[in-house]
Amino acid sequence: MAVIVRRPGPPLSGLVTAIVYRAGEQPQTSVEKILPSPETGLWVNLNRDEFRSFDQAGASRGVAGAMLAGPTSRACLIEFEQGHAHVSVTFALGAASRFAGPSLPEARDELVPLETLWGRSGACLRERLLEAATPADALEVMETVLLRQLTGTLALDPAVAAAARALSRGAGVGEVSRDLGLLPRTLRRRFTAQVGLTPKRFARVQRLQRLVRDLDGHARADWAAMAARHGYADQPHLADEFRDLAGVTPGEYLRSRVNGPNHLRPGGAGPAGAACG
């Protein structure tokens, strides 16, 4: 297994969390359910020019091997190849709009080919990475491409950043709107444009993320206590939210985790998850 991480300098340092090369950590090809996340990422498959996702019925959908994975509002099913090698970019929350532009809200729950966003530069990116002499060189190429795609016309919105921090801590959307002096519809418009999710959906996804991080490493849970700790009305409310966002019951989640808190073996009762894209 090989993992190389590059932390870009200014002006990307506040926009890109990391550029990462990974290879050889997948022992066999498998399909995994991925929990919803507000993060937006860029992925380039170095094994083949394709990524694959699956719907509830098992039908697969392919997308080009260089793509933007938008924020997700529900669980999705993705194939991970044996010996998978890829380059990925993790954007700081709200920063992907500087690279995806006004297309970011349309990328929600989608895998978007980079050619669609960047034209020829996106279409040729995978080939350029494969031509790099070393993985470290490939990461340098990726940083250079990001610099060229960076647009200065979409400044990060301080109100959106403040709202995201408050919502991530568990504040309500109405409370955040009042504290920022914004009408709810104004906050919704500005927040969705830069994050890709509405404030309400973002808050629900972040609450689920706080919950699963709290559960990480535990085989059992006191669900009533977890509901109270993470802002659910009661245990049934927690269970309903879990099924709606993750497609499994809380108990099924504990039994099906693989590779960290956000990856599950497909199956279980309830919606099986939707295809990303």
Roles of regions detected by a PLM:
Residues 1-184, 194-199, 213-218, 222-233, ...:
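Alpha-helical bundle regulatory/interaction domains
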Residues 186-189, 205:
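Hydrophobic alpha-helical segments, especially transmembrane helices
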Residues 191, 203, 241-243, 254:
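DNA major-groove recognition helix of helix-turn-helix
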Residues 246:
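A glycine-rich, hydrophobic loop/mini-helix early in the fold
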